[in-house]
Swiss-Prot record:
Record field: compositional bias (Gly residues): 435-450
Cellular-component GO terms for this entry: cytosol
The protein's assembly and partners: Component of the RNA degradosome, which is a multiprotein complex involved in RNA processing and mRNA degradation.
Organism name: Xanthomonas euvesicatoria pv. vesicatoria (strain 85-10) (Xanthomonas campestris pv. vesicatoria)
Domain Helicase C-terminal, first and last residues per copy: 231-393
Family: Belongs to the DEAD box helicase family. RhlB subfamily.
Origin organism lineage: Bacteria, Pseudomonadati, Pseudomonadota, Gammaproteobacteria, Lysobacterales
Intervals of motif DEAD box: 166-169
Name the UniProt record assigns to this protein: ATP-dependent RNA helicase RhlB
Compositionally biased tracts (Basic and acidic residues): 419-432, 451-462
Subcellular location: Cytoplasm
Motif extent (Q motif): 9-37
Ranges where the record places region Disordered: 391-560
Name of the gene encoding the protein in the UniProt record: rhlB
Keyword list, A-Z: ATP-binding, Cytoplasm, Helicase, Hydrolase, Nucleotide-binding, RNA-binding
Length: 573
């Protein structure tokens, strides 16, 4: 981005709807950024655009102005039903979709346009009811929208006049391109439909998508001297893994009160780093895939209001978040992808402001540094890790932000957030029948809290299954010895009393030469067994030593042959 973020081109110089111009002026937008000044002359007459610009340069406002102006000055298609949407804006992440919807409502609330926000992780039926009532503009992530289009036939895109693909390169990274193509084929042909595509990088695959589904798009590129924003001061430290948390605390203590984002590579480290910061008195929010969507929105809103000092996030929040006033971005872990580095540090120094991007190159992730420096075409200045930086400064008492007391509660602690997230995830799996330990269909019988399993003992412990008897086979010796009545009844149909007797716990009695061992307890059945008509004596089992089978007289053993051979050799000498 150039040092001059605004151009001399004004919004009033375009042929915009008067109500739209009034809304822009009331929101404080009078002059265009470079990407807006390039996009609007092409998009307002109805041309397709493939635009490339860095994050934070005003791409969102550029396509929102084009969409709203078209819907205000042009009539809908003749075959459109009142509930069919006229415009579709697709974003790769929930956070970006939420931000676009917030900006759209801000500018279009007084224009009579109806907006719908569609994304996963929230109430399905409520979104479906909103779509069935009819909207003008749908702002969505691809997955949830396809569910409404394909499975439930809630939305029809046959009358969609204009489609916007924001962060198209991120769509590829997240595997949404098949979904995008599916949705584009449900819209009017590209000669009738206007398509606006925006991306931080116009790679070969992005341009291939543009030329396949767009009508001779005009490629617009905002020229920049470097890949990263010019007003971002970058520096990098080389700490060990053990020094990273201490170094982070030391640097944070030297920038008290500044709005800060900390990026890590894994969801597990989001919780670990956030807990450490919270223990040292910082008010921390977290954004990761483990945090429920509603809680993410609440934490993001509090961070934007200044009620949270630090936001710890994975790359799910690296793109599309329009948060004003972020002064510091920490790469606690260097990202694997160089493009993710650019988008992370793009959270600061937006629209001409200044900011700092501080990265830690530990032994685990330092291998990513050469690729990052090659991608941004510059060397990142290296700062030494000194003992002074590893010593956090004492923190000054923090002044609460207005409205903080009403929103602050114990439920927003990091530990509580992740514990509730795990409990919610476990409850959802239980409702879907996904857990092994559930009472329904459980084999182990543990965790479900149900009754005793069939075939278990009175103490609840499992007993081994009996092998089925073969016709004519003699009863097992143990059964005959221990309880003649049970052994006699084994060949007949089992009755309830016999089955209960078999399940009753009992101590096995050893016998020597047919006599019980002295002191052994007799077996006690849980259910009385009827007396036999003719009692039999217990079978005696006598162990006898096993003798080797006699060898035939005609074939001497191996030892005999060896001995005979040795004697012949000795006598021969």
């Amino acid at each position: 981005m150039s040092d001059k973020p605004l151009t001399d081109v004004t919004f009033s110089s375009f042929d915009l709807h008067p109500a739209l111009i009034a809304g822009l002026e009331s929101a404080g937008f009078t002059r265009c950024t470079p990407i807006q000044a390039l996009t609007l002359p092409v998009a307002l007459p109805g041309g397709d655009v493939a635009g490339q610009a860095q994050t934070g340069t005003g791409k969102t406002l550029a396509f929102l102005v084009a969409v709203m102006n078209r819907l205000l000055i042009r009539p809908a298609l003749a075959d459109r039903k009142p509930e069919d949407p006229r415009a579709l804006i697709l974003a790769p992440t929930r956070e970006l979709a939420i931000q676009i919807h917030k900006d759209a409502v801000k500018f279009g609330a007084d224009l009579g346009l109806r907006f719908a926000l569609v994304y996963g992780g929230v109430d399905y039926d409520k979104q479906r009811e909103l779509l069935q009532q009819g909207v003008d503009v749908i702002i969505a992530t691809p997955g949830r929208l396809i569910d409404y289009v394909k499975q439930h036939k809630v939305v029809s895109l046959h009358a969609c006049e204009i489609c916007v693909l924001d962060e198209a390169d991120r769509m590829f990274d997240l595997g949404f391109i098949k979904d995008i193509r599916f949705l584009l084929r449900r819209m009017p042909e590209r000669g009738t439909r206007q398509t606006l595509l925006f991306s931080a990088t116009l790679s070969h695959r992005v341009l291939e998508l543009a030329y396949e589904h767009m009508n001779e798009p005009e490629k617009l590129v905002v020229e920049t001297e470097s890949i990263t924003a010019a007003r971002v001061r970058q520096r990098i430290y080389f700490p060990s893994d053990e020094e990273k948390q201490t170094l982070l605390l030391g640097l944070l203590s030297r920038s008290e009160g500044a709005r800060t984002m900390v990026f890590v590579n894994t969801k597990a480290f989001v919780e670990r780093v956030a807990r450490t910061l919270e223990r040292h008195g910082y008010r921390v929010g977290v954004l990761s895939g483990d945090v429920p969507q509603k809680k993410r929105e609440s934490l993001l809103n509090r961070f934007q209001k200044g009620q949270l000092e630090i936001l710890v996030a994975t790359d799910v929040a690296a793109r599309g978040l329009h948060i004003d006033g972020v002064k510091y971005v920490y790469n606690y872990d260097l990202p694997f992808d160089a493009e993710d580095y650019v988008h992370r540090i793009g959270r600061t120094a937006r629209l001409g402001e200044e900011g700092d991007a501080i990265s830690f190159a530990c032994e685990r992730y330092a291998m990513s540094l050469p690729d990052i420096e090659a991608y941004i075409e510059q060397k990142i200045p290296v700062e030494p890790v000194t003992s002074e930086l590893l010593t956090p400064l004492p923190r000054a008492p923090r002044v609460p932000v207005e409205g903080e007391e009403a929103d602050d509660d114990a439920g927003d602690s990091v530990g509580t957030i992740f514990r509730e997230a795990r409990e919610q995830r476990a409850a959802e799996e239980q409702r879907r029948g996904g857990g092994r330990s559930g009472s329904g269909g459980s084999r182990s019988g543990s965790g479900g809290g149900g009754g005793r399993r069939e075939g278990a003992g009175a103490d609840g412990k499992p007993r081994p299954r009996r092998k089925p008897r073969v016709e004519g086979q003699a009863p097992a010796t143990a059964a005959s010895t221990e309880h003649p009545v049970v052994a006699a009844a084994a060949g007949q149909a089992p009755s309830a009393g016999v089955a209960d007797a078999e399940r009753a716990p009992r101590k096995r009695r050893r016998r020597r030469n047919g006599r019980p061992v002295e002191g052994a307890e007799p077996a006690v059945a849980s259910t009385p067994v009827p007396a036999p008509a003719a009692p039999r004596k217990p079978t005696q089992v006598v162990a006898k030593p096993v003798r080797a089978a006699a060898k035939p007289s005609g074939s001497p053993s191996l030892l005999s042959r060896i001995g005979r051979r040795l004697r012949s050799l000795v006598s021969g000498n």
